[in-house]
């Protein structure tokens, strides 16, 4: 009897020890999982010849999970815990490890802007953006809208695979300002004959990972887009994002990006990314009287201004509405670039940018107005 009690006590003790150990292991595993975040791992240029499999191994060996390897950026999107981040930063083949930040649409705020930038003067000459491909890197475009001609696209939002559905309405509004058709309904776009491509990188809440945006820009490069419109941005810089934006520009694409809706903060720049990168055309917003919108971001990186207050444009479901924002100003510049290229198809993206900036109407201090309001009639001379 005494022996039996001893055996039961021993069995209970072993069970208790096992349970505590298992619980501790589970807690450690849960702790590890909870610290995992999304990152972009960049490899050194000297490692550009490294195979995709080897790059994947470098990350996997540290406990990371590779989500995507980029085409034009020597980097990969991955999920990492803190330990993996520290180990990868020490790896001799790794150049950088940066958080895969989230960008947001710069929403919101009528075609008065079309006349304000002198687009009708080009229309009357027969230049309306024909044969120019514009990638709208945004929340998708409602391709069923009767006032839009969407020629193609792709989605890089994992949970929203249809680029022709726009849950936030932002991308559809942007698309209308660029190229709403010259017909008997709705509104008129800056370049009504331009070909629109829906490149979805923002979800229905208007947010998207930087890695999704990088994928979208890579798609635009691979599919020979002439103009990229990015009415989006974030407060944090990214080596990978800058690399792919620079690649797009070196590939001959005109890249217009919204400066942001952060207003001004003394002498501190409030321009967001990717607009802050020198290779982009950073666009601020003015109203119908050419006064800077109070929300328009300011900074030395600002390049030009365009209408961005109460801009009437297309919305999903065949409807229309007015939004405010540098998001609404930027497509005026993208559309203007398409108009110029339809008149001067041999011009380089650098020439298009130079003409837009050098012919802009001076409005005031460049910190707040850049070179001024774009004048596409003058730019296309």
Swiss-Prot record:
Residues 111-380 form the Peptidase S8 domain. Residues 30-106 form a propeptide. Residues 38-103 form the Inhibitor I9 domain. It is found in: Secreted. The keyword Membrane does not apply. Residues 1-29 form the signal peptide. Pfam families: Inhibitor_I9 (PF05922), Peptidase_S8 (PF00082). The active site is at residues 138, 170, 327. One of its GO terms (cellular component) is extracellular region. Ca(2+) 1 binds at residues 108, 147, 181, 183, 185, 187. Disruption phenotype: Wild-type sporulation, cells have only 10% of wild-type serine protease activity. GO terms for biological process: proteolysis; sporulation resulting in formation of a cellular spore. Changing residue 138 to N: Prevents intramolecular processing to an active enzyme. Ca(2+) 2 binds at residues 275, 277, 280, 303. Keywords: Autocatalytic cleavage, Calcium, Hydrolase, Metal-binding, Protease, Secreted, Serine protease, Signal, Sporulation, Zymogen. It is an enzyme of class 3 (hydrolase). Secretion of subtilisin is associated with onset of sporulation, and many mutations which block sporulation at early stages affect expression levels of subtilisin. However, subtilisin is not necessary for normal sporulation. Belongs to the peptidase S8 family. The propeptide functions as an intramolecular chaperone which is essential for the correct folding of the protease domain but is not required for enzymatic function of the folded protein. It is autoprocessed and degraded after completion of the folding process. PANTHER family: CEREVISIN-RELATED, PEPTIDASE S8. This is Subtilisin E. It comes from Bacillus subtilis (strain 168).
